[in-house]
């Protein structure tokens, strides 16, 4: 599915019946969450709330787009694919770009050249009069209360920006980083930027603070970017490829970029077709140990299904807001699976498989069950080749992609087990695992800060479960042989099946 920008994508969805408009007034304070939660659980359409209602009954001038990625099919379409299965092709492209191999012949050389040319052809282009700057708010006009920002759950601390595409650049880096981090509104022009220590934005900020102490850190936030750019920011793109270039590959057209208006943000480029852009800085604060303004964030209902603990994060002060005419505010909520992050996880799972198989050819399938909060549990199917092989694969998965450093549980099974069928996985665990021999415990590893089950915030343990058949060296006992029916008997019963239960004459 090809499209120009978010509006074009929405138009195509609406033509297919995958986007519905809600004309009735609906509040972004809790009501939208409940509506979208019901829609998502029913595999329902994306929704455009045309009249977001304030608490006093007034109507916001900006409509709200929600549940955009509420089905894996729409995620696939957003990534330029026609189906979930086609996402594996994207994974194969990324695996080649991540670790290209020397061609083994002219045909492979030609394919590699074609791929390289297609990547080169998708270099972003500059736009001098971008749609995202048709309207500009400055000074006292900068007021986040003018936007219909959702409050998702009853215990949430404040309205929360959820789909903001955060653009940063480290002082020693040539390329920008795109990341999606939630942002708590704390005043008319300030939000708390909740990025974890390992994320690209936090790393850029840390480098800036070391290289330029006491100087404001520039940030731009794009709201309502096109789906390819949004999804490119959560995909494991090789460091040699910019997310904007990758978005062009997905979309089938070069990403149009614009420079920020604020002079101190001149090095940051934003999607020219985005609906809304926030421009500003993290300001210095000599009274804080980091040297920069921080505030206590949360609590918020999160993808774990719980409210998270409060913690200190940088404050982003917004100097200027630019937008398209008649802008659309793109929003979501997170909660106990299923939610949009869980749906994204199922879709991106198909991108991960070829990347893993490039590094570990013995892996035949890989699955992140949505019940595992997107990434906390991984199920791996493999062709085992030697004793201890399953444990090697466990450690390989934990260390291969940054996304898997927070995976708490890995279960490895043989190639005869369908990792997408819980019944088979549980059968393998209960019949092929000895708890002492076949579990691997690793202490003091990185853990999601939202995981309150860990003894220390951000640091906890991992468990690997080897649910494969055991080879000599792993057991001294004779291993069991699975029960299977003889093929000729199954074929014979297939032939007679239709007549077995027919009622005869007189019955």
UniProtKB/Swiss-Prot annotation:
Any Gene Ontology CC annotation: cytosol
One MF term in the entry's GO annotations: metal ion binding
Cofactor remark: Binds 1 prenylated FMN per subunit.
Enzyme class: lyase
Domain of life: Bacteria
Cofactor(s) it depends on: prenylated FMN; Mn(2+)
E.C. code: 4.1.1.98
Pfam families: UbiD, UbiD_C, UbiD_N
Active-site annotation: 302 (proton donor)
Keywords in alphabetical order: Cell membrane, Decarboxylase, Flavoprotein, FMN, Lyase, Manganese, Membrane, Metal-binding, Ubiquinone biosynthesis
UniProt: prenylated FMN binding residues: 180-182, 194-196, 199-200
InterPro entries per record: UbiD (IPR002830), UbiD-like_C (IPR049381), UbiD-like_N (IPR049383), UbiD_bacteria (IPR023677), UbiD_Rift_dom (IPR048304)
Pathway entry: Cofactor biosynthesis; ubiquinone biosynthesis
UniProt subcellular location: Cell membrane
Catalytic activity: a 4-hydroxy-3-(all-trans-polyprenyl)benzoate + H(+) = a 2-(all-trans-polyprenyl)phenol + CO2
GO biological process: ubiquinone biosynthetic process
Family the UniProt entry places it in: Belongs to the UbiD family.
Quaternary structure (record): Homohexamer.
HAMAP family found in the cross-reference section: UbiD (MF_01636)
Name of protein: 3-octaprenyl-4-hydroxybenzoate carboxy-lyase
UniProt lineage: Bacteria, Pseudomonadati, Pseudomonadota, Betaproteobacteria, Burkholderiales
